[in-house]
Amino acid sequence: MKVERSIEIAAPPDAVYDVVMDPERLGEWVTVHDSLVHAPDGVLEQGDELAQRLKIAHKCFNVTWQVAVAHRPRDVEWEGRCPMGTKARVSYDLEPRGDGTCFNYVNEYELPGGPLGKIGGKAFQRTAAKEADRTLVKLKGLFER
């Protein structure tokens, strides 16, 4: 399953990159973020790993993320391991637009459970899409107050 979203942010890609790659700032913009379990200090680099507690639809669970790609200030890819064998891949493309950034977000994930997982997956996808929209609006708000 896949969720894709984009938003224009009135800040240069370097500034946006610094925020989205700082684990201590996740709570400021990621709506499903509950807490950090562990993470390195400062701006993350390729190969770094963090564990995050997420809360989606009143359910909490931990996800371990590895930064698979980090090409400052343009491209980021995360690989996530979730409970019950669920895998996720999230990418950010920070496209320069004049003095600002077009932040392109893609979240691809595989839910366990075969056909039953796919049925429940449709509801999960709707929730994930709604939260992606809310998250990107919060990120934009950090720069456009």
Where do the model's predicted regions map?
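Conserved beta-strand segments that form the floor/walls of ligand-binding pockets within enzyme
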Residues: K2, E8, Q66, E77, ...
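Glycine-rich portal/gate segments that line the openings of hydrophobic small-molecule binding cavities
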Residues: V37-P83, R97, C102, R134-R145
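Short, surface-exposed coil-to-beta transition loops
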Residues: K2-E4, C60-T64, T86-S91
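A generic structural motif
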Residues: T31, P73, G85-K87
